[in-house]
Amino acid sequence: MKTQHLGETKVKISRLAYGNMRSVGTWKPAEVTPEKMEAAIESHIAAYEAGYTHFDSADIYCAGQCEIALGKTLKRVKGMKKAITIATKCGIRFGGDPNPDSPHRYDFSAEHILWSCDNSLKNLDIERIDLYYLHRPDLLMNPPEIAKAFNKLKKAGKVKHFGVSNFLPSFVTTLQAFLDEPLVANQVEIHPARLDPYYDGTLDQCIEKNITPLAWSPLAGGWLGTGRELKADHPEFEKRKKLLDTIDAVAGEWGLSRTVIVLAWLMKHPSKIVPIIGSNNPANIKEAVKADDVELTREQWYRILVAARGKPLP
């Protein structure tokens, strides 16, 4: 698989990333059986063997079990640890943490950032995280406090680079003003059924500041690939059907699957979007890599955009 630089760093990552949110098959740690953990390890190995060199996780994915699965994979596969880059995230706290009446919330306090990083390093069984994200915007974020936490992690050798996830441009600009080094990534939801980043300045900022945009849920939870949620009683049935029909037409022109075309559509943008593949199916993981060799024409790209909008361009 081809590679690209992560932001303005010298670090190179694969053009598609592997995300392990679903790797253990549950969000409840008590349900992670040895069989599920083994299946998760096999999924990571399948991605590595298919050419993925950037692996994405988060502290909240099954309360750290997904990070543990990646860590176990690194132990099993000789040379993998040095051949890949590892990203994980902090900042989301679910309801009940730490007290029964504690609400679901976001926490960018220095205390939580530092604690979460140490916990992730333990789960992953590594010494340094290549890319450490703030997961979702904390409206109480104090940039100087975050900067101090980042500096402490950097100085301790625990984190190589920092990024953000689900941040609008204004949040990125505000935080960046207080940091000693540039943010290198912004991971947001991007796919033909969610066009906001194309219009709200997110991708423009990525180009301007040389920030790598990574797309989580690039297939809209899978339905852009399978069409499984295309039901006649859905309020956007006609729009979705037109979109899938258009994608199918382009896929037919290439002799490729709908999934590959959707990924190639994202990768066409000059901001160099990196789609994050979250399948546990080795065949699907391998199939997605075909998008790296597809260069849609401008006409094909715009046909999909117009169908995604559900109305003609002005």
Predicted regions and their residues:
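Acidic (Asp/Glu)-rich catalytic clusters
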Residues: 8, 74-81, 121-125, 154, ...
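A short, structured active-site edge motif that brings together acidic residues
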Residues: 82-95, 189-190
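Surface-exposed, active-site-proximal loop segments in enzymatic domains
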Residues: 94-107, 228-232
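Beta/alpha (TIM)-barrel catalytic core signal, keyed to glycine-rich beta->alpha loops juxtaposed to Asp/Glu
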Residues: 137-314
